[in-house]
Amino acid sequence: MKEYQVYLERSRSRQQDFLYPLLFREYIYGLAYSHHFHRSIFLENVGYDNKYSLLIVKRLITRMYQQNHLIISANDSPKNPFWGYNKNLDCQIISEGFAIVVEIPFFRQLSSSFEEAEILKSFKNLRSIHSIFPFLEDKFTYLNYVSDIRIPYPIHLEILVQILRYWVKDAPFFHLLRLFLYHFCNWNSFISTKKWISTFSKSNPRLFLFLHNFYVCEYEYILVFLRNKSSHLGFKSFSIFFERIFFYGKREHLGKVFAKDFSYPLTFFKDPNIHYVRYQGKCILASKNAPFLMNKWKHYFIHLWQCFFDVWSQPRMININPLSEHSFQLLGYFSNVRLNRSVVRSQMLQNTFLIEIVIKKLDIIVPIIPLIRSLAKAKFCNVLGEPISKPVWADSSDFDIIDRFLRICRNLSHYYNGSSKKKSLYRIKYILRLSCIKTLACKHKSTVRAFLKRSGSEELLQEFFTEEEEIISLIFPRDSSTLQRLHRNRIWYLDILFSNDLVHDE
């Protein structure tokens, strides 16, 4: 067991000593925004662009040292003169530069791991959210049991800092990290309280996503490490889906995980039919084996979280159900395996046999109730799904109002085009279309019927229903049977890097 501990320490021995020498050199910020580092793999297109001057960041850091208020305690007042006149803006600007510098070595390490795993060529395709669903269609129809797992929270901030200590040996790095965390939340609180996440993720999205990614990657790293060091079988398939905070992976032959000091014996079992998929804070674990082995996996995950991360995970957070009787929610879809039964009559000489054939098919359905709840929250309809006007947008021009509704409709249609049943998607498009008409009628202080009759906008609003057909017809002829089949079948897009906010309404 000491051998495992040595291996783990050796694999983590490439610690980074990078922070303070870089923060004072403006050219590192230029490097961060250069061809290689101008986009974070953790968060793309955050929308900051040129809002933050690199010279301002350097001056703010210099002012921090001149004021000499780097030492803080848990009892300090939020109105610390250290932050100057606009402490929120100062902290936000510095944290942006801080996050960029921190991401550089981890980005290089991730790129090297991709090259070693020979999956760098497929990295671009794996960035699409829809790349998960072909994998589910290919594998889950052969499995029997599924387990919904929610990655436990909360995790204490001090535990998060201690996890980073495995990889970074620069003490000033942790002083500055604690400074940012203390500024945005109570140090004695937890990382995943809703109020703190809402505040921190909006003001510091880059730093927040980096910390969240690191926490999740660490627990998955331990599982992969233990499996690699204790099994003679190599991975047949392993890949990472990296888009903002979303990951995708398939892991086989994972093992039993004990306390972080590895003082207990490590025992592993081989399970070539286990499949693991994670999206945000939720995991899906599926297997072909009996519930007994799935319960073992449940124990392994709980033991890892409690012993290594000191996070209490309730057993009810992990549910094990037959895949044919349970629908699991992932990426805004409801998915389950449907059994299609058919009877075939077979005759041999004078004997006739009836043979029942069962074919498994993965059903991926649009969750109509959560979507209507999201639309009602966004004031497009009421809780019953009846469209209402959007008075907030009434000050915009007619073209802008229609364009806003069309963009939302396009995004949802694009995202949910892989659904097995399109009726729910058509209902959502109808709600948005009628809400758009009511908004225009409200702006012109008219009824819906009178507005459509006077302005002739009905033809323009047909784009809500015809755009998808026009796009597909560019590839296939209109009279083609393939075109008709595509309207009924699923279409997965490999260019979707993020989902609409309406998809993730809680």
Swiss-Prot record:
Usually encoded in the trnK tRNA gene intron. Probably assists in splicing its own and other chloroplast group II introns. Keywords: Chloroplast, mRNA processing, Plastid, RNA-binding, tRNA processing. One of its GO terms (cellular component) is chloroplast. It is found in: Plastid, Chloroplast. The keyword RNA-binding applies. InterPro entries: Domain_X, Maturase_MatK, Maturase_MatK_N. The lineage of its organism: Eukaryota, Viridiplantae, Streptophyta, Embryophyta, Tracheophyta. This is Maturase K. Belongs to the intron maturase 2 family. MatK subfamily. The keyword Lipoprotein does not apply. GO terms for molecular function: RNA binding. Its main location: plastid. GO terms for biological process: mRNA processing; RNA splicing; tRNA processing.
